[in-house]
Amino acid sequence: MTDLPFVSALVQADLPVWKQCLQTEFLQKMENGTLSEDCFKSYLVEDSLYLREYAKIFAWGMTKATTMAAMRTYYSLLSFVQENEDLTRLRYLEQYGLREADIQSLPPRPENRAYLDCMIDAARNGEGEAECLMACLPCMLSYGWLFQKLLKRSPAVKDTYYGALVLDYASPGYDAACRAWAERAEAACTGLSPERAARCRTIFRACSEHELHFWEMCAAPRTDI
C-alpha cells in the first residue's frame, strides 16, 4: 500500500501491535492445532456480537460520506464482508448447535465491550467519514495481515478444523476488499488538518490495541454457552 501514504503510515506504525496479536495464545494454538473447541466456540460468539455493532460503524460512515460513489463503496464492501464472514461463521455456529438469534441476547465480554464502545464513540462523535474508517479499518486490515502471515508460516493450518476461517481471511478476495477499503480511507483522509489527522491516527492505534485485547481475551472460553 505504498501508494496510499496515510494508510500505509498507519499500518507501519501499528505493525508492532499486530505482531503481538500474532503471538497471542489463541492464534498460536490455532496455528499449531491445539486450540480447544471451547475457546473457538467462544471466539465465534464474541465475533458475532462484535460484527453486529461493527456493521453500524459502516452505516455511520455511509451517512457521513459526501458523494454517491463513496456511499456505493460502503454498500458493496459491507455486503462482501458480511457475506464472506457470515457464511463460514454461521457454518461453524451450526456445528456447535448455536443459533445467531440466541447469541445476540448474550452480553459481550468486557474486552469486547470496551472495543465496541471505542469504535462507536469514534464514529458517532467524529467530524465525518474519516473517523468512521479509522475505527473499522484496524479490524479488517489486521485480520488480512494476521491470517496471511499465519498461513504462510504454517501452511498445514488450512487442513485443520479452523482452516476454513483462516482461508477466508487469507484469500485474494478478502485482500482485494481490504485494498478497496484502504483506498476509501486514503481518499477520506486526504487534506485533513494536522489536528484531525492526529485524531485519526489516535483512533486507529486505539482500535489496533483493542484488537490485541480481543485476541488475548479469546484464550479463555466463555462459561455461559
Model-found features: residue ranges?
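Basic/polar N-terminal segments that are highly enriched at the extreme N-terminus
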Residues: 1-8, 12, 223-225
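Hydrophobic alpha-helical segments
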Residues: 2-6, 119-120, 216, 220
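Short alpha-helical hairpin
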Residues: 11-35, 54, 182-191
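Alpha-helical bundle segments that constitute or directly flank the non-heme di-iron/ferroxidase center
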Residues: 15-20, 34-64, 84, 134-144, ...
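Secondary-structure edge/capping motif, primarily at the C-terminal ends of alpha-helices
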Residues: 61-65, 122-126, 150-154, 188, ...
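Active-site-proximal alpha-helical scaffolds that flank and shape metal-associated catalytic sites
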Residues: 69-176, 205, 209
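Long amphipathic all-alpha helical oligomerization modules
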Residues: 173-205
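Acidic, carboxylate-rich catalytic segments that either coordinate divalent cations
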Residues: 199-225
